[in-house]
Amino acid sequence: MSEPFILTITNAVATISINDAPHNRMMLDYIDALEEELPRLRDDERVRALVFTAEGLEHFSVGMNLKQFGEGAERKGGADGLLDQRLRVLNMIETLGKPSIATLFGYCLGGG
């Protein structure tokens, strides 16, 4: 499998691009990687803003990969553990202290 997202930093803007075209499902490794990367971006003085986008031309995201939900729930200590992680990641984005922008197109489904 390819990397869950592509991260670039240009002119003080970090761009995180979901890398699962054409549907850009929220895979477990995407959430894990975001949880790991967001604190680094928060602390990186070169980064003044974040842009969330997605690869391909069809959809920003069709939401969570439901085929992975059972596996993820087991790995995270049940469905509540999996959903708690997603909430932590959303809270990290909200409290990052840097503006974040999402460039949405096509379907944009999910919780948050």
Where are these predicted regions, by residue range?
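Conserved CoA-thioester-binding segment of acyl-CoA-metabolizing enzymes
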Residues: M1-T53, L57, N91
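Short, histidine-centered active-site or binding-site loop motifs used for metal coordination
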Residues: I18-P22, A73, L104
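Structured helix-beta-strand junction loops
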Residues: D44, G72, L96-P99
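Glycine- (often His-adjacent) and acidic-residue-rich active-site loop
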Residues: A54-M92, C108
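Glycine-rich beta-to-alpha active-site loop
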Residues: R88-G112
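Residues at alpha-helix caps and immediate loop-helix transition turns in enzyme cores, especially N-
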Residues: M26-Y30, V62, G112
